[in-house]
Amino acid sequence: MHLLQEPVNKLKFFHALVAGGVAGMVVDIALFPIDTVKTRLQSELGFWRAGGFRGIYKGLAPAAAGSAPTAALFFCTYECGKQFLSSVTQTKDSPYVHMAAASAAEVLACLIRVPVEIAKQRSQTLQGNKQSGLQILLRAYRTEGLKRGLYRGFGSTIMREIPFSLIQFPLWEYFKLQWTPLTGFDSTPFSVALCGAVAGGISAGLTTPLDVVKTRIMLAERESLNRRRSARRILHGIYLERGFSGLFAGFVPRVLWITLGGAFFFGFYDLTTRILGATSTDH
């Protein structure tokens, strides 16, 4: 049985790799302007000083370069983790399996995501001036080192991503399971996209304060207090400075971006998986 199962696992791994990469790149490029607006709203500089509506595509290059490998690594880990945990626990479609697999996937994906976010967000808020994404990363490494430069905000990014995934993926899997019983229609890439949009929008709204903290830490200048403050102290400082609205800065573009992104991402992921599955069956 193990020998028969092995090629299927490898095939699923390959499908997740390709489908995740395609879906991630499509989303990041198509919805990049919304992400820029969100980042500038959350910046310590304020929206207009961070660039306003100028240069709305600044930072696209590092985002495009990093989106495919980040998404591919995430979905490979998620699908393989889900398959492994389901076999170990002898359960199928358990929300706890989805939560554990998504959490592990987020930690690994952040190894690529965090340096990409550093380059992208500093470009978006015009901190990189006319430097390329690679130049921004090299400068961060030379002046601040690996941990405080290239991987600044690693902890706060995980602190944002894991709660986000703990909400999003069980919801997405649950909505997919309920689609046919509730509607009477078979699952399609469109239905998967719709489920992803709703799950993503809910998750994005609830985790906005964590996203604000992550943005503040990544954009902090060398002399900024945010470089040395804990996430809790940064949240408290934002609340004292701007009140409740400060904690949810960028709420509308974040929810819009991830709702649309969820539709694109999960829809393209499902479509690509189906195409690859049909191709491998033909051969």
From Swiss-Prot:
<keyword id="KW-1133">Transmembrane helix</keyword>
<feature type="transmembrane region" description="Helical; Name=4">
    <location>
        <begin position="152"/>
        <end position="172"/>
    </location>
</feature>
<dbReference type="InterPro" id="IPR002067">
    <property type="entry name" value="Mit_carrier"/>
</dbReference>
<dbReference type="GO" id="GO:0015805">
    <property type="term" value="P:S-adenosyl-L-methionine transport"/>
</dbReference>
<comment type="similarity">
    <text>Belongs to the mitochondrial carrier (TC 2.A.29) family.</text>
</comment>
<dbReference type="GO" id="GO:0005743">
    <property type="term" value="C:mitochondrial inner membrane"/>
</dbReference>
<feature type="transmembrane region" description="Helical; Name=3">
    <location>
        <begin position="99"/>
        <end position="119"/>
    </location>
</feature>
<keyword id="KW-0472">Membrane</keyword>
<feature type="repeat" description="Solcar 3">
    <location>
        <begin position="187"/>
        <end position="275"/>
    </location>
</feature>
<dbReference type="InterPro" id="IPR018108">
    <property type="entry name" value="Mitochondrial_sb/sol_carrier"/>
</dbReference>
<feature type="transmembrane region" description="Helical; Name=5">
    <location>
        <begin position="190"/>
        <end position="210"/>
    </location>
</feature>
<dbReference type="GO" id="GO:0000095">
    <property type="term" value="F:S-adenosyl-L-methionine transmembrane transporter activity"/>
</dbReference>
<feature type="transmembrane region" description="Helical; Name=1">
    <location>
        <begin position="14"/>
        <end position="34"/>
    </location>
</feature>
<feature type="transmembrane region" description="Helical; Name=2">
    <location>
        <begin position="55"/>
        <end position="75"/>
    </location>
</feature>
<keyword id="KW-0813">Transport</keyword>
<feature type="repeat" description="Solcar 2">
    <location>
        <begin position="93"/>
        <end position="178"/>
    </location>
</feature>
<keyword id="KW-0999">Mitochondrion inner membrane</keyword>
<comment type="function">
    <text>Mitochondrial solute carriers shuttle metabolites, nucleotides, and cofactors through the mitochondrial inner membrane. May mediate the transport of S-adenosylmethionine (SAM) into the mitochondria.</text>
</comment>
<protein>
    <recommendedName>
        <fullName>S-adenosylmethionine mitochondrial carrier protein homolog</fullName>
    </recommendedName>
</protein>
<feature type="transmembrane region" description="Helical; Name=6">
    <location>
        <begin position="248"/>
        <end position="268"/>
    </location>
</feature>
<keyword id="KW-0812">Transmembrane</keyword>
<feature type="repeat" description="Solcar 1">
    <location>
        <begin position="11"/>
        <end position="84"/>
    </location>
</feature>
<keyword id="KW-0949">S-adenosyl-L-methionine</keyword>
<keyword id="KW-0677">Repeat</keyword>
<dbReference type="Pfam" id="PF00153">
    <property type="entry name" value="Mito_carr"/>
</dbReference>
<keyword id="KW-0496">Mitochondrion</keyword>
<dbReference type="InterPro" id="IPR023395">
    <property type="entry name" value="Mt_carrier_dom_sf"/>
</dbReference>
